Amino acid sequence: MARILITSAIPYINGIKHLGNLVGSQLPADLYARYMRGRGHEVMFICATDEHGTPAELAAAKAGKPVEDYCAEMHEVQKEIAAGFRLSFDHFGRSSSARNHRLTQHFAGALAENGFIEEVVERQFFSVADNRFLPDRYIEGTCPNCGYDKARGDQCENCTKQLDPTDLIDPRSAISGSTELELRETKHLYLRQRALKDEIEAWIDSKTDWPVLTTSIAKKWLHDGEGLQDRGITRDLKWGVPVRKGSEPWPGMEGKVFYVWFDAPIEYIAGTAEWADANGKADADWERWWRTDRGAEDVRYVQFMGKDNVPFHTLSFPATIMGSREPWKLVDYIKSFNYLNYDGGQFSTSQGRGVFMDQALSILPADYWRWWLLSHAPENSDSEFTWENFQSSVNKDLADVLGNLVSRVTKFCRSKFGETVPAGGSPGEREHQLVAELQQQLAAYETCMEAMEVRKAAAELRALWVAGNEYLQSAAPWTVVKTDPEQAQAMIRLALNLIRLYAVISRPFIPDAAASMMASLGCEDWSWPADVGRALEVLPPGHGFTTPEVLFRKITDEERAEWQTRFSGVRT
């Protein structure tokens, strides 16, 4: 049994996330976690809300609430929606937790002690209209690289280029919109990433199995232009982790907080500590996942994120870990994703464009969305959500292929043999061929899941469903029963066991439907089918079942048209 540590990029607290956020991190991470648990491995799956920095302050101000209250409220909202999508986190934490405060301050102290922190006096925009310094994300303007007119002072979300506020063309305050900005002096802490560049580059070079998307972004940031730059890790904000050198005050840093991108990844570790606290466990129970001197040397750590998060996870967070000179676990594999676009435009939380997670759940159950998003995951290039494609995929894959098989088999058995697994007959050549075919296809499915090739895994799973349908079509038990009822019983006995097999292997993608299939079969045996032949004998003759309700209903043309109009691209 392996030990798998899984973290998903933690979502900002500033509102409900859209489907592009979901498919770019949390959902594929959940798929992998569920699969690994299903194979019998020990899994720790951690996520949290990212509650500090400019997004939180701006969103709270817009909502007219104190930032602490806003974050507490939105954490519960995001936690509830995550549960609605059946995201199986072992813990869903908060970056504003006391654990993360202490751990962030600890890392800063360790970095300073090892000479990787520099105090820098810099010139920063001060808004006369707002009477305050403006951290990078409080400034908007036009990106000098791609011309996007809503770029932020730290990064352009359109082209992902890292920016300095002074790089922006026509900068303005994100608070008031005022262009009356002055450059004034202020002192900040910088993480000396350049001093760690050789270590980071050697570490990245050692990860020969990483996706091209991950390594290409990391190396671009390492080498493009002037190469890897030192990174400011403090901000002139009120809300955040107060700057301290470990447990001690940091002279000259009074009233400042750590930059959100410094403390947010540390929440992966802190969130695991929160898990221990919430479950009455000792520190040793979370440290065995994170400290290589306390049991984490055999852990495989996998991160999931959108491509815009890759630079921070391949450069800045590893620099924090390496520079601490402490035995913390570094990530083994980073699964990154391109963007999911929406009907000809971009999904965007800040711009309110696209279908958001709460809206999605209000019109269809989670499995419909999970299946479409994962089977169209933007792995090798950007992908696009369209209502026509969504309707087609749901109707063909879920309703026609899987749902239809479950319905036909259970209803036919009930009408001809009753609601028990029939005992007659024995498998023939056709059944043996099916078992061999399924064994081969299952191996292909497992290979894709192990490699986190999400779209390919979905295609292999669908192929497994199709194989069952093709068997039923060729075997035609509804015809055979007229001349050889014993043989028809053998076919249906296999088909009922096939439903259980599908429930087990489909669970990572469509957990609710899998649970419904198992419940209708009166079965609680979720063991992974190492041997397909044996797996198709788990339900013995005489075992009772119930005929389930429709597993997946079809989306009508009228519904599709209505939703397309209702979700025309802007959330109001």
From Swiss-Prot:
GO terms for cellular component: aminoacyl-tRNA synthetase multienzyme complex; cytosol. InterPro entries: Anticodon_Met, Met-tRNA_ligase_1, Met-tRNA_synth, Methionyl/Leucyl_tRNA_Synth, MetRS_core, MetRS_Zn, Rossmann-like_a/b/a_fold, tRNAsynth_Ia_anticodon-bd. The keyword Transferase does not apply. Zn(2+) binds at residues 143, 146, 156, 159. One of its GO terms (biological process) is methionyl-tRNA aminoacylation. Keywords: Aminoacyl-tRNA synthetase, ATP-binding, Cytoplasm, Ligase, Metal-binding, Nucleotide-binding, Protein biosynthesis, Zinc. A motif ('KMSKS' region) lies at residues 346-350. Binds 1 zinc ion per subunit. Pfam families: Anticodon_3, tRNA-synt_1g. GO terms for molecular function: ATP binding; metal ion binding; methionine-tRNA ligase activity. It is found in: Cytoplasm. Is required not only for elongation of protein synthesis but also for the initiation of all mRNA translation through initiator tRNA(fMet) aminoacylation. NCBIfam families: metG (TIGR00398). Monomer. This is Methionine--tRNA ligase. It comes from Cereibacter sphaeroides (strain KD131 / KCTC 12085) (Rhodobacter sphaeroides).
